[in-house]
Amino acid sequence: MAAVALPLLLLLASPATPTPARDPFSPQLGDTQRCQQRCRQRHPGLPPAQPEPEGPSESPNNKAVLINACERGCRLFSICRFVARSSRPNATETECEAACTEAYVKAKEQQACSEGCWGQIPEPETQLEQKELALDPPSGSLSLRHLFTMLCSDLMSSAQDLISSTWTYSLQTDNRKTQPVVENFAFQGSRLQRVEVTWRGSHPKALEVHMDPMSPLEKVRRAKPHLKTSKAKVESEDQQESDFLSCMSRRSGLPRWVLFCCLFLSVLIILWLSCCTLVTTPGQHLKFQPLTAEQHKGLLVESNWPLYPPLPPAYEDSPPPYKLKLDLTTL
C-alpha cells in the first residue's frame, strides 16, 4: 500500500496545469507574453449586472472567450507588423482592428480583440536602441554589426545624394548661344520634388526658378543675381566644360578623377593583353641540340640515299609486239 500511495501523493503535489510551451514564431513575430498577461489582468471577471442574453450556461465561459479574443488580438498585431514592417504603428493598429472586426461578430469580442491590438504596440525604436547599447559590453573597437550598419547608412546616403544631384543641360536659343538649364531633384519631406533653374539671355538679369512636385511647372520666384564676369572667364569655363570627362561626369554623376582612373586602367589592361598575345608559353618551344663532327661524318658515310629515283618495273602482262611478214605483201 505504501508503494501505491507514494505515486498518488506525487501526482497530487504536482501542478494541475502544464507549463506553457514557448511559441516557435516568437523570434519573428515578437513576444506576446506581456500582452497576454495584460489581457488576463484586464478581464478578471464579468460584472453581475450584464448577463449574457443567450442563457446562463454560457456566462462562465464568457471570461475565457474574452481573454482568448484579447490574446488573439495580440497575435494579430504581431502578424500585421511582421507583414508590413516598414509601416507606421498607427497603420498596423488599424489593420489589426479591421482583422478583429472580420474575425468576431459580437461587439464585446471585437472590443477585447482591439484591446489586444492596443496592448501589443511595441516600444519606440529609440528606447530599444538604448537598451541594446546598454546591454552591449564596452569595447574600444567597433563590432561587426556596427560596421555593417555604418556601411549600409553610407550607401543609403550616397544613393540619396546621387538622386538629389544636379544635372545640367545646354539648349540652343535664337541668338546661337548656349544657355544652361539646371534641374535639381531633391526630397521635400517624403515627396520627390524637381526644381528647374533657367538662365535667360546672354547677359541675364534674372534667374527663373520652377518647382514641379506632381503637376506642370509653376513659377514660384524670380531672383536677380549680380553677375560680374568677364568674357575671358566665361570662355575659359566653356572650354573646361566642353571636354569629354566633364561631359561624362555631368551625365553619370561621378567625379572626374573616378572616370580618369577607369579610363587609365582600361588602357593599361588593353596594353597588357596585347603584350601577352605576343609571348608564347615555354612548353611550345622546340629545342634543337647541335650535332658533333662525328655525328655529321656518320650521316655522310652511312647514308645510302639513291641519286635518282628508280625506274618503274616493266609491265609483264602487256601483249607482244605485232610482227608483219613482208614477203607475203605485194606492192
From Swiss-Prot:
Q: According to its UniProt record, what is one Pfam family this protein matches?
A: BSMAP
| Subcellular locations according to the entry | Golgi apparatus membrane
Q: How does it sit in the membrane?
A: Single-pass type I membrane protein
Q: What is this protein called?
A: Transmembrane protein 59-like
> Keywords on this record?
Glycoprotein, Golgi apparatus, Membrane, Signal, Transmembrane, Transmembrane helix
Q: Which organism is it from?
A: Rattus norvegicus (Rat)
Ranked from the top, the taxonomy reads: Eukaryota, Metazoa, Chordata, Craniata, Vertebrata
Superkingdom of the organism of origin? Eukaryota
Short motif (Microbody targeting signal): ranges: 329-331
Q: Name the family.
A: Belongs to the TMEM59 family.
Annotated Pro residues bias: 45-54
A GO cellular component annotated for this chain's UniProt record is: Golgi membrane
Sequence intervals crossing the membrane: 258-278
Q: Where is the signal peptide?
A: 1-21
Q: What is its main location?
A: Golgi
Q: Which residues are glycosylated?
A: N90
Q: GO terms for biological process?
A: branching involved in ureteric bud morphogenesis
State the residue spans of region: Disordered: 15-62
What this protein is reported to do is described as: Modulates the O-glycosylation and complex N-glycosylation steps occurring during the Golgi maturation of APP. Inhibits APP transport to the cell surface and further shedding.
Identify the gene encoding this protein. Tmem59l
